[in-house]
């Protein structure tokens, strides 16, 4: 087995779910591996049910994992740390559930993941904090126009993605 081209599929051998990876993404960071080996791995991933196979650099992988996975966990944990959280029942519905869902984490594991990917995660945190600060400042200044522009900017980004 050539360790430069072999990558694990997580806990697939521990799980009994037939469609565990159905339509999930499989990310390959070739790191100089031969193209034919990369294609074999990509085809294997597709055959076992992965919906998307993404070939990328380690740097882009780390940036995108910071944004798509780690940042939402930071956001969710920060959100539920509000003193309002214990009293949310009767007031909350889908928005609370959507934002807070990923706060239910293994804190030791995620601490390790955050620290291993700290630079890209810090960059994403800085961007999020900047965006939140802009919205906060517009609310504080009672600047309806700026606030609406910021909210519309987020809406346009999400809509352009077709989501």
Can you say where each PLM-predicted feature lies in the sequence?
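Single conserved hydrophobic/aromatic residue that forms the stacking wall/gate
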Residues: 2-13
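Interdomain hinge/lid region at the active-site interface
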Residues: 87-154
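Structural alpha-helical scaffold elements that stabilize or flank donor/cofactor-binding regions
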Residues: 5, 19-20
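Short, flexible, solvent-exposed loop/turn segments with mixed acidic/basic and small polar residues
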Residues: 14-19, 112
